[in-house]
Every structure is written in structure tokens, then in C-alpha cells.
Amino acid sequence: MTMSQEENPVKPWGGRFSEPTDAFVERFTASVTFDQRLYHHDINGSIAHATMLASVGVLSEDEKTAIIDGLEAIRSDIVEGKFDWSISLEDVHMNIEAELTKRIGITGKKLHTGRSRNDQVATDIRLYLRDEIDNIAKELTRLQSGILDLAEREADTIMPGFTHLQTAQPVTFGHHLMAWYEMMTRDYTRLMDCRERLNQSPLGAAALAGTTYPIDREQTAALLGFNHPTRNSLDSVSDRDFAIEFSAFAAILMTHLSRASEELVLWASAQFNFINLPDRFCTGSSIMPQKKNPDVPELVRGKTGRVNGHLISLLTLMKSQPLAYNKDNQEDKEPLFDAIDTVKDCLRAFADMVPAIESKKESMYEAAKRGFSTATDLADYLVRKGIPFRDSHEVVGKAVGYGVETGKDLSEMTLEELQGFSKEIQQDVFDVLTLEGSVAARNHIGGTAPAQVRIAVENAKQELEGRNS
């Protein structure tokens, strides 16, 4: 695609003005450099509008056919990179309309009857975002499917669970991965909620008050796949809630991916040594030959900041605008478009990478043995022996202190040593102090027991199948 700036082109709104637009102002106010990506949806909206105008007698059938054929020819040229975009024509809408008029003559000037760029762009963005939401939903589902496959493989793999990044209790790797899955399930439902709310047609709201032509908004809404028309013309052209809502979804999703990225970076480090990331998802150092850097999760973590920033940009953009449309709204597109592009790239990176993660089971297991991760199990054991929990907490705390001094884990102490803290402790205590016993005992809905992880994975697989049916 080429870009040009014509000398004093005829403006579609030029009748009111006595001098041409300043060349700098043309560049400053133009949006075609970034909104041209809306061309497909702009053409679809125009075809629906022309079809409706013909059905209510504003256009003849011949005029409708000429407009639609002309628009389809323009679409083909854009796809093939043969279309010349003009900054002087400001935006995607005026570029396409001007070219249509150039090709089919005066009939092209009738296309905009009963329509404003205000409802036109609102329609275009909704159509575009709806398609991108569907694309993102597919990629998010692919990532979740990969998480389930890995969680199923790692249902029995024991690792330390952390709070405050300190060893807390043993969990299974599969259970930890299913926590990622749950985060992203919430993301998916938020995305679908956003889609439902945006799927209303503003076309026909015109500039702000509607139009005097006998338009059929139900028809254009149906032709474009919307659930129904919007209910208030002022709100229709002013509303950008759908862009803000999508950006909020994107920010939360990216925050979840960032948290997962941080864990992958830590786990892949020599200090943790929990996982191996395949070489194809890592890079090296220009000076240190030994380095294998987890660049993909690091970059996902870094890109979260820009997506979060886009949400703030859109909120700030809208916060002081009176009704109805204002030129400020031109600034909604770049943050929205970049958020969409970034989310898609990050989801693709994760969806490709996660199924290829290799766990280092022995290293995970040894790490879980350190840090007295079964201390809570010992406290619960004493409760079952009739000791109040707060008292058992005190007893186990003293046993841990002894372990720190002697370098012994609770499971490594003798029965005599343990009974020095409570006579209620018997030989059966060693059944609950093993890592395997600890995770197996948490055998309830949402628990870390391998059996529960497998149930959770199976339920989640059925959930994903339901999305695709």
C-alpha cells in the first residue's frame, strides 16, 4: 500500500471553508496511516448501508449494484496492495468513498446518504473488534488446551508451593498449572461478556440525532451480524465502552501471562532448576557463551506494561468528553489496535511454548523437601490427636526451630525427637510427613492431590469442548 498527500484535494466537507487546510494540519489530523486496517469492515458496513438504502427506496437497484461492485473492486485492490491511500483524505472512510466516486461517478456520492462518519467509524470498530475477539478467543483456548496437556502429564510431579516466595506446602506441578488455567478461564468469560455487549449496531445514528431518511436499522444490524441496533443515537456515536472493556480484559489477561512468565523465568533459572525451556524459545548472550536466556516469557512480562498503559490511555481519553462525538476519539484506535496485536502475539508465544516445557522432577522434589513444607501436616496431625490448632501450631513451630538448628527436616527426625515436643506424636506421624502423603491427603475439590488434578483436567477438557461445539 502506498501513501500520498495530494495538493488541495476536494474535501467532502469543503463547502463551508474559504481556504484549503494547512498541510501540517492535514498530516496532524489524518488517521489513515493507522485506521486503514479497518478497510474490510468499512466496506462491509457500506455494503449493508447501501443494501438498506435500496430496500427503502433511497437508492435504485442499479445504484446499489454499482456501489457494491465498486466497493468489492476496491477491496480487492487493497488486499493486493494496489490501493493508493491519501493522507489528504484523512481516514479510511473518505479514502474509500473518494475512490468509489472516482470509479462509478455521481452514484458514489449517494452512498453516504443518511450516514455520518460518526456512526460509520463506531460501526467499523465494533465489527473489527468483534472479529479480533473471536481470533483471540481461539488462541486463548489453544493456550488453555496446552496447559491441560502439560498439567495431565505432571499430575503426580511434586514441587514446593510458595507464599511470599517462601516454601509453604508441597503441591503438584499439575495443580499449579491448573491455577493458570483457572485465571485464563476468567479471562475468557470476560472476553465473551465484552463481545456480547459490543455486538450492537450504531449504524443509522448518523452524526448524533439520527436521520430524516426512512432507514431500517434492524436490517443493517442483521446484515452485519449484530444482535440488534443500539437504542440511543447520542450514545451510539459517543460510546467507546467496548474499547475500554476490551482493554481491561487485555490488561487482566496480560497480568496473568506476566505472572506466569515470572514463574517460568524463575523456574528456568539455575537457582530453581525446575524446568527446561526448549532452545527455540530462548536466546543467548553476545558475550557470555554459557547463557540461555528465557526471552519469550521475559518479553511477555515486559509487554504487559504497554497493554496496561493502553487501558489508562482510553480511560483518560474519554473522561472529559461531552456528548456526542469529538475529534479526541480518533485517539482510541492506536491503543486499541496495539493492545489487540500484543495480546495475540503473547498468546501465540505462550500457546506454542507451554506444551513444550520439560519438568525437572527430581529437582522439584528435592526443593519441596527443603523448607519444612509438611509442617502444616504435622499441625493437622496433632489436631486429630485432640490438641487445639493454636497449641499444635506452637508445638510444630518449636519443632521447626529445632530442625533449623540441627539441619533436619521434620521427616528426618526420629520419633524420640518429635515426641520431645509432644507425647501425642506416634509412629504413624511419618505417614503424613512424606511429600506424597501430604499432597495425597488434600483430596477434595480444588485440592492438590493427583486424583483431584486429573478430575480437574478432565472437567476442563469438557469445558473447552463445549466452547468449540
From Swiss-Prot:
Key word Amino-acid biosynthesis present: yes
InterPro entries per the record? Arg_succ_lyase_C (IPR029419), Argininosuccinate_lyase (IPR009049), Fumarase/histidase_N (IPR024083), Fumarate_lyase_CS (IPR020557), Fumarate_lyase_fam (IPR000362), Fumarate_lyase_N (IPR022761), L-Aspartase-like (IPR008948)
Q: Which SUPFAM superfamilies match?
A: L-aspartase-like (SSF48557)
Q: Name one GO molecular function term.
A: argininosuccinate lyase activity
Q: Give the record's GO CC terms.
A: cytosol
Q: Where in the cell is it found?
A: Cytoplasm
A Gene Ontology biological process term: L-arginine biosynthetic process
Pathway given in the UniProt record: Amino-acid biosynthesis; L-arginine biosynthesis; L-arginine from L-ornithine and carbamoyl phosphate: step 3/3
Q: Which Gene3D superfamilies match?
A: Fumarase/aspartase (C-terminal domain), Fumarase/aspartase (Central domain), Fumarase/aspartase (N-terminal domain)
Under the heading PROSITE patterns, the entry gives: FUMARATE_LYASES
Reaction equation(s) it catalyzes: 2-(N(omega)-L-arginino)succinate = fumarate + L-arginine
Q: Which UniProt keywords apply?
A: Amino-acid biosynthesis, Arginine biosynthesis, Cytoplasm, Lyase
Q: What is its EC number?
A: 4.3.2.1
**HAMAP family registered for this protein in UniProt:** Arg_succ_lyase (MF_00006)
Q: Which NCBIfam families match?
A: argH (TIGR00838)
Q: What name does this protein carry?
A: Argininosuccinate lyase
Q: Which organism is it from?
A: Saccharophagus degradans (strain 2-40 / ATCC 43961 / DSM 17024)
